[in-house]
Amino acid sequence: QTTEILLCLSPVEVANLKEGINFFRNKSTGKDYILYKNKSRLRACKNMCKHQGGLFIKDIEDLAGRSVRCTKHNWKLDVSTMKYINPPESFCQDELVVEMDENNRLLLLELNPPNPWDLQPRSPEELAFGEVQITYLTHACMDLKLGDKRMVFDPWLIGPAFARGWWLLHEPPSDWLERLCQADLIYISHLHSDHLSYPTLKKLAGRRPDIPIYVGNTERPVFWNLNQSGVQLTNINIVPFGIWQQVDKNLRFMILMDGVHPEMDTCIIVEYKGHKILNTVDCTRPNGGRLPMKVALMMSDFAGGASGFPMTFSGGKFTEEWKAQFIKTERKKLLNYKAQLVKNLQPRIYCPFAGYFVESHPSDKYIKETNTKNDPNELNNLIKKNSDVITWTPRPGATLDLARMLKDPTDSKGIVEPPEGTKIYKDSWDFEPYLEILNAAVGDEIFLHSSWIKEYFTWAGFKDYNLVVRMIETDEDFNPFPGGYDYLVDFLDLSFPKERPQREHPYEEIHSRVDVIRHVVKNGLLWDELYIGFQTRLQRDPDIYHHLFWNHFQIKLPLMPPNWKSFLMCCEQNEPGILQECTTT
């Protein structure tokens, strides 16, 4: 590894260090740093939030003078411990090495391992026209022709994502299934259903069950739910991070992890004859922010809106005016962040994708109207204003010829748009088959027994945390579902009281559409189906994001669903119910 000097303080500056937090900027690089002094002990880090790269400022609410606050999302970092305190018990900040040299200057050092993509380097070779072509299908799905090989990214071509909350904005090309079947390999970045689409893969498996699919070796396996899905795929390859995977003499790829969500999120570098294509997909900080520069083509998400926050929240500050202003500000921050990332990495071509979804079900009209997305053209214009990067706003079926674009960006054949009259945006969605699957769970025998609640949350395994949650089953419009369950869960001791405990405790109310929550419970699915899918309405007191709770239910639930067969057998022997304290509304 190499050692890089990030900041050098003179002996006078060292002598003037104050107790507590000190902010510094390297004027030659424009980079910011934080140095914390506690008597003779010094700790240092980059002034960059681990979440989305925001700048820290002094936290005026911290009278002890140990914490800083991010200007993007109000995350807070205790610099004395290098642990984030909002959200509580979440992340740790990467520390820098502090050293004094022989001239009594203070140095902030960063130890950098070698970039894995620089191992076994290949110089770019000249490409023939038509040799490398990238065709956009929809959302995050790209079809790459790389010589005589074809590679597809993240195929979501039919059905919803996140239960019933997301639907495709763009109409995929009519030959999408043929394209998938002709692929030599498929890369699936992570387990979210707008990238890992079981309805799409079921269609593909009916024709090519042995198609090679590659995923990263994440803590939560991408295909953790494959057996339960019923999709017959027989050639799934889990590959280690940061190692070239050779496809043929000209083509290789490398999967990298996300720096914020390494347990589930990945990105990829594809290299053909020395020309790199970087796809950061949904990663918040892909590879911890260390990425190859000056690649031939970079693509990333851009739209925002992939969260239930703040649209699904109410009470306290969550007025419609506050939500609208927050969303507007957040989208602008995301645009600036993506534009700065592109400016820093200097790819030859940049393409915004992986954000083309819509909340099209009539019951989600409020979300659709409130959850505005970024315009890809606005991002591309911002990029072009600050750099010489070529930008491409893709339309379904449009094809980019890499050789032509690298040689002459003005070549009219560099990007071939779909034929005139091609349908670009979807105007109808086949809701019913997918809603029927969800509705089937509502009348399941499991929910005839109130003891399912204790069974489910015991299976989930989250406890010893001071949080009380009220779960309320609702209809389509988030009104209490007739005969539905309304119950409390105290996660400190995993009990199910009739009333909130007397002790001081954080409290959340989660109103969930009955078809989705019961489908999730029955099948042991992750709560992203609820939260990212806009299938809940939430209130919380105090207004704190409980990272441990949500992270557990969104990513750390057991890999196998609850054993409901055994549960029902026990119920037959123990009626009228194991969990007498739970009542129905």
UniProtKB/Swiss-Prot annotation:
Protein name from the UniProt record: Cytidine monophosphate-N-acetylneuraminic acid hydroxylase
Domain Rieske: 9-107
Keyword annotations of the record: 2Fe-2S, Cytoplasm, Electron transport, Iron, Iron-sulfur, Metal-binding, Oxidoreductase, Transport
Subcellular location: Cytoplasm
Gene that this sequence comes from: CMAH
EC number, UniProt record: 1.14.18.2
Similarity section: Belongs to the CMP-Neu5Ac hydroxylase family.
A Pfam family per the record: Rieske
Signal peptide segment: none
Disulphide-bonded residues: none
Gene3D superfamilies per record: Ribonuclease Z/Hydroxyacylglutathione hydrolase-like, Rieske [2Fe-2S] iron-sulphur domain
GO cellular component, one term: cytoplasm
Organism of derivation: Pongo pygmaeus (Bornean orangutan)
Cofactor note: Binds 1 [2Fe-2S] cluster per subunit.
Biological processes per GO annotation: CMP-N-acetylneuraminate metabolic process; N-acetylneuraminate metabolic process
InterPro entries given in the database record: CMP-Neu5Ac_hydroxylase_Rieske, Cnh, RibonucZ/Hydroxyglut_hydro, Rieske_2Fe-2S, Rieske_2Fe-2S_sf
Reaction(s) catalysed (UniProt annotation): CMP-N-acetyl-beta-neuraminate + 2 Fe(II)-[cytochrome b5] + O2 + 2 H(+) = CMP-N-glycoloyl-beta-neuraminate + 2 Fe(III)-[cytochrome b5] + H2O
Binding, [2Fe-2S] cluster: 49, 51, 70, 73
Function, in words: Sialic acids are components of carbohydrate chains of glycoconjugates and are involved in cell-cell recognition and cell-pathogen interactions. Catalyzes the conversion of CMP-N-acetylneuraminic acid (CMP-Neu5Ac) into its hydroxylated derivative CMP-N-glycolylneuraminic acid (CMP-Neu5Gc), a sialic acid abundantly expressed at the surface of many cells.
Domain of life according to the entry: Eukaryota
Enzyme class: oxidoreductase
